[in-house]
């Protein structure tokens, strides 16, 4: 079976249950698919919109989904200075990872291993959620996010929300008497909102308009695109395909796989004060089903590069505050490791310092531009790095000619 066919089936595997549930919903005069005039969304998606922006659903009453997923930043975190906004009951509990963009997740397949054993798909940095519905459960109960003590606590807040009556009308008058069902329906509503609202997948960047023949890229942007695509230069398109799909669909700039890049440790993450703590992505600590796969330790999901110019800081740990820094790291990590990693007492560079030594072998050192050593020239010059960064800026949604 082709990779494209496999991905299509995987995507359908988590969209089909949603369609069945939506068909079954409707406790009042309006069904789940009825469009609400004020939003253009179905009733269930409009409820999801309200849940997404509702700070009263958190223990602090100051955090909502939108707090870490700002539409002006590709539905990622808004601050380049904070890895993730502090949460918890007092809004002082530090997080562990940079909040990823929620844009363009509608076509992400559920997690699977392909025919060659490559981990692919799934949501979040480690792919542990197979759908937007599943992913939505974590922030409500996470101690460093919305920090509800348990599922009934979330539902108790839903019961008194301003849209509670709409929730009852859609899901049944007694829905809040069953916390499991009510919490699940809230997650279904959040998923429906993210699938329906165009702001999560507008395809209106300058690059999209370039592909449609409506605008031209500048000479420098075209040079950056060529460097981005070239296997001998940036080789970015190897994991972030830039061409239309075989069916003419616009590129998502991710192949949904995972990679271990050996990103430097970020001292701004409070947990990193403990030298024994490591975020190992696919094999833990937040995902546990692959804990025995030592070969996957340190691998994180390849993100879409759409809106990358407005989603700083970069990488799973938010180590780099600017896009130029992030691109420079890719092409200079192996030729100039002293620029990125600390030195030991004897002056040697402690490369891959955010991984235990036994997992250093997992870091990608074979593909371009990583397949170089100190003393060799980087795959991209400083000027070429600037050109790639200029091209990446064309992937920001909302372009106005």
Located regions from the model:
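Post-cleavage N-terminal segment of exported redox proteins
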Residues: 2-51, 143, 147, 151-222, ...
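Short glycine/threonine-rich turn/loop motifs
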Residues: 30-135, 202-343
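Extracellular low-complexity, Gly/Ser/Thr-rich intrinsically disordered linkers
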Residues: 304-401
